[in-house]
């Protein structure tokens, strides 16, 4: 270890080597030693938690021009390459010698060889930054440690906002996840993200978009999903929110594909997480924590009327990194959907912009990065090391034609399989590809799946069997249309949530349908009046909650066909789907291709 420390001493800032030596973590020192030799930086800067270090990173982000200071105190803006604006599915690989359905794999030795070649000498002439973080609260049974190595001040600045710095927790050879990133060169053809499950290491090069470069975000999710499946807990792409009911607060997790309502749902309750959740079982109860302490959110469409909490965060002094929005000539920002007057000209990720060009002022996947503590609706348990008990789970999709706004599952297995594992959603701008194309995306997590869905779902089902009280599971859809017009307003989600809370509290009844339990009209009418102060007509209800049996049948058959291709799929998955299909067919024989909720209520 001494020789490795002596080598690092030539690169690391004064006194940091002593700190590194004091925590006595030989694998950590060897890891840093190997990465420095691989990437060949001019110097190395460790972030161990001091205010001085955090300020140093902020200054470096500005000096490097990776960020530009804006007129509001604490606000900066970052621009990514015009072709590096979203998660790069086609350039992201799980290193595996076995092909996995729906997972982009590459043989391990081939992938490592390619990546190490790209990283060799990639930091020459630059400074390397090393951050030491905790996923989940410190001193918690949920805690997972992670190290980020990067040559991008913007990336490490983002990590400092989004994650708990936990250098001292790395003592005595504690295990940790490893993330190595180099912004490399602006050559998208050489952009690569490789996830090495065998060594709990993720490599990323020739990219700066945070979804590809900020390791502890969605890159870490691949590693924690694997860890969760091996250990029997859940690592999920879910918000954690507390909703107040007549009997107190109830915590829900909420899973939505990116850009489909997850952040907006988390803003109507007490916020713990807007994106990720670790869920473990303690004494038969499911408890959850947020691995993060910040928000990396989509900004398009955020306006003062619909999103007052986020709007306040983005306009008050405090630490905010905007990315790929428009910077105006006076140092302010503008984004599409803000409902503010569009500026005459400005600067965005493509360079100079003017209104007459007709081009959008900001990218549809433009983002903001802020600390959780900036939000006025932050829950008091946001950093509770013991987590919060989960009473409900929401699986939401962007479906324009079929799914009702809210439905409750009959049971844990019914909800996991026919709602969560059957999710199909219109693709959004958060991933590269054609928008609005309906795609299979179970639990909104397929992009991050490092293993077979069979293993993942088996763990999910087994987790529920260990619970003495499992959360109720709900399917949400905010995007149902009729004649190409949305059937709901943005604020209606507050009513669907309120009904779910009443179901948890057992203060509302429900109508039995072949696809689950739906609300009675009178209950929703009362909730619309109480929650939103507006009337809710029978015609609205009937359009929203008519069960389109034929379309549900087609969907169920599609999902069955998908899962039958998996050799090792749990029999419970196919059986649950086949039972759903039989129920739907029975209802088609009785009612036809669709059935009004009023008719079901009478029957």
Curated annotation (Swiss-Prot):
Keywords: Cytoplasm, Decarboxylase, Gluconeogenesis, GTP-binding, Lyase, Manganese, Metal-binding, Nucleotide-binding
EC id: 4.1.1.32
Pathway participation: Carbohydrate biosynthesis; gluconeogenesis
Cofactor binding note: Binds 1 Mn(2+) ion per subunit.
Enzyme class, broadest EC rank: lyase
Residues holding GTP: 259-264, 367, 398
CC annotations in GO: cytosol
GO annotation (BP), single: gluconeogenesis
UniProt-listed Pfam families: PEPCK_GTP, PEPCK_N
Binding annotation for Mn(2+): 218, 237, 275
Keyword RNA-binding: no
UniProt record similarity statement: Belongs to the phosphoenolpyruvate carboxykinase [GTP] family.
Protein name: Phosphoenolpyruvate carboxykinase [GTP]
Gene name linked to the record: pckG
